[in-house]
């Protein structure tokens, strides 16, 4: 069977490829073929502009011949004995590998990964992989993800599994060695550490190797999931394992999260995926406000704790306390030599700026979590930041019942009212934030405002105001 390729007339880069049977039987492809053939295009490889060349190739791999022209004969024969000087099949990867520093391109060639896919991605400046849906697998209710290949002549699509990482991403060396052995045995020999969702991904597993690979992964004590319309793998900051600013035990809460919601993590039941992130303080090292459908942020309600001796010692060592006070968003800090640092509790916004800058200032003791919802980077209406659902809840372990009951109530509202494949942020935007708060049973409070109002003109009906003397 004959194949028809539309390629760049200058560099020969193939833009699209069809079979003669497809052009004869599929009107959609025939129409696109005529459209591309008759228009001027820009080659993504050499950036040359012009009409595409119609090249026809026999299925058996015969010589390529441009339509309407004979194949050009070579003016000179190739010298005998110089085959070793042929052009490298991966020139751009070779260029990356040059130099005295280690190169990922060099290491990639040592694995089973089809390096021509990466070479073509470098040349075209875009990935040659795409989303290919799911593969059903017994024992994995959410399915296994498939990466579709845009270049089937190089390689077919490949599967990859997402492994739920332990709290804090603390892997033992024995567990990591076991995962590396599984990757070498069943896949490309590559581990993705870690994805933007906090997963460990095992790449390039052929369909026939999926079952034994998953069985060996689970035998190491790991769960497979984070696909489909369920709770995706939650991500948390390292919290009390290293940071002294954390306002609750992020690692303990995440462990309790999986005990409470493990079924919803492994069995899809929501209108769309739900990403959850846990930050120990408003610094938000996990970017939960930008990316999480459900975001638990550590907060405190009283004034920061000030160790006057540490602050004075820091100032004596050259600390610029004047600049810190002037840049406080709430203008709540005042420094007086000899009297120390004073913080106005009513003006404090609890933003962590002073705690980040001054060693002697630490968060207050009235601590808990704020529940925010609706953050995302993609979706129907584009990026959105999270909105406050509940401004403060005490995070009391080990089961964190009050926090999880609030989240469960919210997910019931989302499950009952959202449309299919509608993210949480898109759902809130469609019905309106006021209607969403009513459905969730949230009492209005100043902390729920997105921003202060700028229009000070107000209108009200007499019946809306109890004290008529205010009219």
Where are the regions a protein language model picked out?
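Short Cys/His-rich "knuckle" micro-motifs
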Residues: 18-21, 53-57, 289, 336-338
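Iron-sulfur cluster-binding cysteine motifs and their immediate structural context
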Residues: 293, 322-343, 347-370
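Short linker/helix segments within small regulatory modules
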Residues: 22-41, 336-343
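Small-residue-enriched alpha-helical segments and adjacent helix-cap loops
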Residues: 94, 132-137, 159-318, 467-471
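Flexible, glycine/charged-enriched surface loops at secondary-structure junctions
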Residues: 188-194, 227-229, 267-273, 335-338, ...
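Short cysteine-rich clusters marking metal-coordination/redox-active sites
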Residues: 8-11, 43-46, 328, 348, ...
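Short metal-binding segments enriched for Cys and/or His
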Residues: 35-61, 356-364
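Charge-rich, low-complexity segments
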Residues: 65-147
